[in-house]
């Protein structure tokens, strides 16, 4: 079975290395594996990178931290859409078609000898994500072959999640009243309207909103609503 050695490997690094070795005869030239937790903040190139969890990256000398590397990782990273959509199997070219718009993107990847890349991603509890990016130096993989490699990749990413991740950091704890009051702020309600809906005095409604804002580390109510959304509390 393709990638079978990875399943018996004792560590995430060993599993990733074994998987890459098994795919090199198929033309694999690049690998990156990660196991991390999805950022609580809005998903951007920076927050995605800061989530860490890098296990193995094999690339040509000098490409990592090059201008080309920074471009595909930070300046123009279309693969964030795959995470937003919860995609498990895809190619880089599914999100970055080979057209004029993404010309510079593919030029940057070519410096790492990546003609295209196959991806497999597993999603676990508490925002756990394990991902595989496997680059190939030419476009010779047919659809059936690519699909078989992606299925094997999912076995690897499930194995990586199985090794375990650090506990998720605990988010702000809002009381049910604080959460409800701020949710009504998100709907554009005034303190008086919130008080009427919740059966409270106006000053008590304001108290709950202000408490929620402070717990979320927000500078004003609009900021608090944004934090409520990014913390997935709404």
Residue ranges: model-predicted function:
Residues 1-5, 12-13, 136-175, 183:
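Juxtadomain coupling helices with adjacent low-complexity linkers
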Residues 5-6, 18-118:
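Regulatory input/activation interfaces that engage signals or partners
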Residues 109, 131-140:
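Short beta-strand-to-loop transition segments that serve as allosteric relay/switch motifs
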Residues 118-125:
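A short, hydrophobic, proline-anchored segment that marks a local hinge/packing element in signaling
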Residues 128:
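Glycine-rich acetyl-CoA-binding "A-motif" of GNAT/NAT acetyltransferases
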Residues 163, 167-204:
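Helix-turn-helix DNA-binding segment
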Residues 208-211:
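Residues within the DNA-recognition helix of helix-turn-helix
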Residues 214-234:
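Basic, Lys/Arg-enriched C-terminal extension of HTH/homeodomain DNA-binding domains
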